């Protein structure tokens, strides 16, 4: 898991466009389209994942929330720069977006990690194994650290880091989607 995140980090740290100063709106549009596709498939999955009484099992409820959190984070994170960007006042137009992304990223571990602990205590240890928890915690913490460094420490926009955060949301959303499809609570 760590190796995969390291490779992704190096890909975003070393590409030819790493020193670019302009927003890559095509990359943001692509990330938004992928997020929208994942959310669309998630909506179908949500409709098919209901149990007989019309609700969700506790693990499915958790994964649906995680799907929506990460998918909507990537979607709105990729759409908002189109609305906010103002070339004449670049720093001022990005700062609210960076602070908003930091708050949104901070919400993830604060909300989802206690729920995972509660689900594991409720008898769902086989559905939430430690490697999956470590994978999700790594993504949560990486997103929080990177967004905090952009919003609070650096104070300016680093487009490749911003795209990296959105990509982490998509990786986490894809992971939750795949696990929801292939690993059910009753199995």
Give, region by region, the residue ranges found by the protein language model:
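N-terminal secretory/membrane targeting signals
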Residues: 1-18
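Juxtamembrane helix-loop boundaries in multi-pass membrane proteins
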Residues: 29-33, 56-75, 123-140
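Terminal transmembrane helical module of multi-pass membrane proteins
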Residues: 141-187
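Hydrophobic alpha-helical transmembrane segments in multi-pass integral membrane proteins
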Residues: 15, 75-82, 137-154
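Hydrophobic transmembrane alpha-helical segments in integral membrane proteins
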Residues: 19-39
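Generic alpha-helical transmembrane segments
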Residues: 35-41, 69-77, 95-113
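N-terminal signal-anchor/start-transfer transmembrane helix
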Residues: 33-52
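Membrane-proximal helix-loop-helix units in multi-pass membrane proteins
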Residues: 83-146
């Amino acid at each position: 898991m760590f190796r995969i995140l390291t490779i992704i980090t190096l890909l975003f740290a070393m590409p030819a466009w790493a020193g670019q100063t302009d927003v890559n709106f095509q990359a943001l549009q692509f990330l938004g389209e992928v997020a929208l596709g994942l959310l669309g498939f998630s909506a179908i999955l949500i409709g098919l994942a209901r149990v007989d009484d019309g609700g969700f099992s506790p693990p499915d409820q958790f994964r649906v929330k995680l799907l929506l959190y990460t998918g909507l984070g990537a979607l709105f994170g990729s759409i908002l720069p189109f609305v906010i960007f103002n070339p004449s006042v670049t720093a001022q137009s990005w700062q609210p977006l960076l602070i908003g992304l930091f708050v949104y990223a901070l919400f993830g571990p604060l909300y989802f990690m206690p729920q995972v602990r509660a689900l594991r205590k409720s008898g769902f240890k086989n559905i939430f194994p430690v490697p999956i928890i470590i994978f999700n915690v790594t993504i949560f913490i990486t997103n929080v650290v990177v967004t905090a460094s952009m919003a609070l420490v650096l104070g300016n926009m680093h487009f490749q880091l911003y795209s990296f955060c959105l990509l982490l949301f998509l990786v986490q959303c894809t992971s939750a989607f795949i696990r929801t499809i292939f690993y059910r609570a009753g199995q």
